Structure formats: structure tokens, C-alpha cells
């Protein structure tokens, strides 16, 4: 992480960089906090990876770019999507309602979940986008444009973690 912190200095806020240092220092506790129920997770679930089409008043959605697929709790994709899709202020204003709709959708499909359980998972997986910013930034060729994008991801998802007090769930 020190090389990432150096790379993001001046592009990501100091508190966001400190957050990453604390996350890395407590990564084993973070993984130990994972719930045991897993599903197929995209792990890069954002608007850029959704294709929409409309025909005869029906809307279809296709999800693309499955290179990071894995077994994770479903709330990890939910937290990543919400954190990546909204401005910080819009996320703050809408996230509880969106998580409630997510829970209602699962329950309607006979996947019994409670809002409190999913909300706790959503808070824990506020880390999803932040971790992706760290990992992806070292896997691709470094460019100024890429650094700006990964710093923006770290800032947005880091603020999500701070707002949700994610660290309290594993530190």
C-alpha cells in the first residue's frame, strides 16, 4: 500500500489514504467479518458494465465484463454499485431506501433476508470499490488518466466507508 499512498498523494484526500493504511493493517479482521452466505458476485458492478435495450415497452439489461467474478456476499455488488453510481450527497440521501428495495426484491424471490442483516453487510462492503481502486491501479499500465480515475474511485468509495463507519465492523 505505501506505493499506492504515494501515487494518490494530492489526488486522494489524506483521510482517504489513511483509511487505506488502516484497512490493509486490519485486512485479516476484515475478511473474518465476512458473512458465510455467498453468491456469484460480479465484483466490478457499475453502470459502465450494464447494457440496456428497449423493445416493445420491455427493457432488458445485460451485465458485461465478468473478469473479476467470484463468490462473495451479494451485498458486496450492491455496495460497489451504489458507491460508484452516485455523487456522495446523492448516495447519502438514497442508500437506505435503495438497500430496502434490494431486500424487498430478494424476499419477493423467496430469499429470506432482513434489512438489518443486509444493511450491516452493505456497510461492511463499502470497502468493495475502495479495494478495487487499489488493486486495479497496480494491475494496469499507469497513466495520468488512470491515476485520476482510481483516485476518484478511492475518494468516492473511501467517503462511503467513512460515512457508513465501515471500520467499526472489523477493527
Per-region residue spans from a language model:
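Catalytic activation segment of kinase domains across protein kinase-like and atypical kinase folds
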Residues: 46-84
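Conserved acidic
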Residues: 37, 90, 94, 114, ...
Amino acid at each position: 500500500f505505501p506505493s499506492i499512498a504515494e501515487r494518490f498523494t494530492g489526488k486522494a484526500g489524506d483521510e482517504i489514504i489513511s483509511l487505506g493504511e488502516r484497512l490493509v493493517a486490519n485486512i485479516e479482521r476484515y475478511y473474518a467479518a465476512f458473512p458465510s452466505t455467498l453468491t456469484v458476485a460480479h465484483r466490478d458492478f457499475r453502470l459502465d458494465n450494464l447494457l440496456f435495450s428497449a423493445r416493445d415497452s420491455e427493457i432488458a439489461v445485460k451485465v458485461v465484463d465478468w473478469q473479476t467474478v467470484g463468490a462473495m456476499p451479494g451485498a458486496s455488488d450492491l455496495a460497489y454499485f451504489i458507491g460508484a453510481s452516485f455523487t456522495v450527497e446523492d448516495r447519502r440521501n438514497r442508500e437506505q431506501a435503495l438497500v430496502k428495495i434490494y431486500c424487498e426484491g430478494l424476499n419477493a424471490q423467496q430469499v429470506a433476508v432482513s434489512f438489518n442483516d443486509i444493511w450491516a453487510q452493505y456497510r461492511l462492503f463499502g470497502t468493495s470499490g475502495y479495494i478495487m481502486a487499489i488493486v486495479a491501479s497496480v494491475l494496469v499500465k499507469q497513466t495520468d488518466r488512470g491515476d485520476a480515475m482510481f483516485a476518484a474511485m478511492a475518494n468516492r468509495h473511501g467517503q462511503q466507508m467513512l460515512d457508513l463507519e465501515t471500520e467499526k465492523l472489523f477493527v
